[in-house]
């Protein structure tokens, strides 16, 4: 699984050379692409980022941490969300806001809000699922969410992410 932001795209090391070249040709020239080596390959579950900050799984190597920082052009922080290492599964961010697992502690909220300088809120998707990564895709212009998401969940996303009209 791949993940990225407006500056770069990260793919797991098992992506073939042909796939890598196809991705590289498909992206604008100013977008970097990088391969992450090692046992962590579900990158969307293990990295949550916007254009300034990347929260990453605590077990990423220093070498991979440097690749993430360089390719995405962000500051990198090893952390957990609601005491879970799968930060990309339990949080989603754009450049204006972020949603996190409902069990996130007040300390974690404050730390994230101070670190990222954006509003942070608790959320669920698809009628109460806490697995945000399985049902939310967001950038600064639009939000996609699972078809079972309730109007209250969608309203919450719209308020937190402040997507452009």
Protein language model annotation of sequence segments:
Residues 1-165:
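The feature marks the mature, well-folded catalytic cores of soluble enzymes
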